[in-house]
UniProtKB/Swiss-Prot annotation:
Family that this chain belongs to: Belongs to the MnmG family.
Protein name (database record): tRNA uridine 5-carboxymethylaminomethyl modification enzyme MnmG
Any one Gene Ontology BP term: tRNA methylation
Chief place of localization: cytoplasm
InterPro entries linked: FAD/NAD-bd_sf, GIDA_C_N, MnmG, MnmG-rel, MnmG-rel_CS, MnmG_C, MnmG_C_subdom, MnmG_C_subdom_sf
Annotated keywords: Cytoplasm, FAD, Flavoprotein, NAD, tRNA processing
């Protein structure tokens, strides 16, 4: 194929899934000329697996994306068909918002947002190779011979890199949902010296809604109380006309069908070579691993308002098509169901993430960034969070500005990226609340208070969003201060109220703020005993006031740990340090440090196999020579 010189750009993003959409929008909105190339324009921000956004940890990521100026939260708020707050009976650290998406509306809305964006060109094309000169990425070449030059490239290829779909004994080259795979680019990345791994993920069958007997399933409705992912979505926009999901279960017959066909299951026959996700196992894997369980939950999730397709969550499988049909017909409510799409597994190449800097720039090739499933993660939200950060950092580098690296104490996005570049992953990585040490301060409700300032500083958060954030922040601070001034006296009314709550009465007067610290007392109950504020408070302000006061002691302890971490993050490790030359370091520590090349003492301390004694030796070694402090 003859090459020709096509247009030049500042940033080129390869792949328009959830990572690529965020990366391209972020770069363009920060003022750099951006090109977004993708294999098929009809699959921009497509949902090839579950038609949903959010859930534990993931929902917080969507809020963080929004607080930084990203798009995912706004997009799902326009296109959901059901919204639910999960874990409402638990503490605020694990509450999570989850939306059922109209997957076609979601993709169409995101594509149109991209098309309307200034500084951003969306184009269909298959990238076959990168233009690399003297170890620096300078652009891309497509299958049609177009050579696009740029100052930075972000690869967000999802599961397309040398993708292969597997259904029973059948295995063929394909991207997700029978789209075209990216073979040339996958091979080229290997040739450039990047270490590549092979992962696997899977998806369940889709069934026809009109053939489901919903009368024998359990209805799962959405919430009546307004909730949104984006801080800019008003309560008045809340969709009260929501679609339910439905709950059913596998049974012993289902399990017998799977058991007798395990000899045809690709994950047990050796056809599947890639490593699968531990936290999203196939149904055949669940039957083997949890043989004592008589049944497994299945959620029937509509894929949109204008389609009959229903996603059978919990039934991910790569068993042969005939077995999938038999399996479905054994499930209550699905006895006569028509399968519209067969479940499948997909294997794909991933860039081993220890080759990345915390900015998501590769260490091997300068100005080349990777994000999303290409880095070994699973999930749309994880992909979008990485895409946003890669796009931001590519733009900042071009502008000659300091990079934006979120710490573990800043957000789940920071936890995820640090896990990837510091610890790596040997299976598709999924964000969990348990991965965050500071989850009490990384909550769904306070992502704006944590990250809006950063988003505004880099030019992504627009003035209207920033002004609304400042108003909310001031209102929270003012109300906390007001509750610290008013006293509640042990009147008959107060004592009678406490008696109805089964709580101890007051001996002396108490500040309203301290009264609210009692676990059984709500803000509304405190409010009845003190004068009302001058202006009625937004429910989100009240929620924030209540959480900050009730959990003040725990939050204070967490913040003390954060400050200690910041001091360690401030101790930078010089580049190209020779760990083999440091006497006293354990052999494993030398190997791990040499491989990962941590940038700070804090990052080094989180590497598996590097113990506190190794860190002490490393700090002494650096302090005897030169130690660079992190700017700011």
């Amino acid at each position: 194929m003859n090459q020709y010189q096509a247009e030049s750009y500042d940033v080129i993003v390869v792949g328009a899934g959830h990572a690529g959409s965020e990366a391209a929008l972020a770069a363009a909105r920060m003022g750099v000329k951006t090109l977004l190339l993708t294999i098929n324009l009809d699959m921009v921000a497509f949902m090839p697996c579950n038609p949903s956004v959010g859930g534990p940890a993931k929902g917080v990521v969507v809020r963080e994306i929004d607080a930084l100026g990203g798009e995912m939260g706004k997009n799902i708020d326009k296109t959901y068909i059901q919204m639910r707050m999960l874990n409402t009976g638990k503490g605020p650290a694990v509450r999570a918002l989850r939306a059922q998406a109209d997957k076609h509306a979601y993709a169409t809305e995101m594509k149109h947002t991209i098309e309307k964006e200034e500084n951003l060109t969306l184009r269909q094309g298959i990238v076959e190779e990168l233009i690399v000169e003297d170890g620096v990425c300078r652009g891309v070449v497509t299958s049609t011979g177009a050579a696009y030059r740029s100052q930075a490239v972000v690869i967000t290829a999802g599961t397309a890199l040398r993708g292969e779909i597997i259904i029973g004994e059948l295995k063929y080259s394909s991207g997700p949902n029978n789209s075209q795979p990216s073979v040339g680019l996958a091979n080229h990345l290997k040739e450039l010296g990047l270490e590549i791994d092979r992962f696997k993920t899977g998806t369940p069958p889709r069934v026809k809604s009109s053939t489901i007997d919903y009368s024998v399933t359990e209805e799962q409705p959405g919430d009546k109380e307004p909730n949104h992912f984006s801080y800019s979505t008003p309560d008045s926009a809340y969709n009260q006309n929501q679609e339910p999901c439905w709950l059913t279960y596998t049974n012993e017959t289902t399990h017998e069908i799977i058991q007798k066909n395990l000899h045809r299951a690709p994950m047990f026959t050796g056809i599947v070579e890639g490593v699968g996700a531990r936290y999203c196992p196939s149904i055949e894997d669940k039957i083997v691993r949890f043989a004592d369980k008589p049944r497994h939950q299945l959620f029937l999730e509509p894929e949109g308002l204008n389609t009959e397709e229903v996603y059978v969550q919990g039934l991910s499988t790569s068993l042969p098509e005939d077995v999938q049909t038999e399996m479905l017909h054994s499930i209550e409510g699905l006895e006569k169901v028509e399968m519209m799409r067969t479940g499948y597994a997909i294997e794909y190449d991933v860039v081993v993430p220890h080759q990345l800097r915390p900015t998501l720039e590769t260490k091997v090739i300068e100005n080349l960034y990777t994000a999303g499933q290409t880095n070994g993660t699973s999930g749309y939200e994880e992909a979008a969070g990485q895409g946003l950060m890669a796009g931001i950092n590519a733009a900042l580098k071009i502008q000659g500005k300091e990079p934006l690296v979120l710490k573990r104490s800043d957000g789940y996005i920071g936890v995820m990226i640090d896990d990837l570049v510091t610890k790596g992953t040997n299976e598709p990585y999924r964000l969990l609340t348990s991965r965050a040490e500071y989850r009490l301060i990384l909550r769904h409700d306070n992502a704006d208070l944590r990250l809006t300032e950063m988003g505004h500083e880099i030019g992504l958060v627009k003035e209207e969003q920033y002004a609304a954030y400042l108003v909310k922040k001031a209102a929270v601070e003012a109300e906390i201060a007001r509750l610290g001034k008013h006293r509640i006296k042990p009147t008959k009314e107060v004592q009678a109220f406490l008696e109805t709550k089964g709580a101890a009465g007051l001996k002396d007067g108490i500040l309203a703020r301290d009264f609210l610290k009692r676990p059984e007392i709500s803000y509304q109950e405190v409010a009845q005993f003190i004068p009302a504020p001058e202006e009625a408070l937004d429910p989100k302000v009240i929620e924030q006031v209540e959480i900050q006061i009730k959990y003040e002691g725990y939050i204070k302890k967490a913040m003390e740990k954060v400050e200690k971490l910041k001091r360690m993050e401030a101790k930078r490790i010089p580049e190209n340090i020779d760990y083999q030359a440091i006497n006293g370091l354990a052999t494993e520590a030398k190997q791990k440090l040499q491989k990962i090349q941590p940038e700070t003492i804090a990052q080094a301390s989180r590497i598996s196999g590097v113990n506190p004694a190794d860190i002490s030796i490393l700090m002494v070694y650096i302090e005897q020579g030169k130690i660079a402090k992190v700017q700011g």
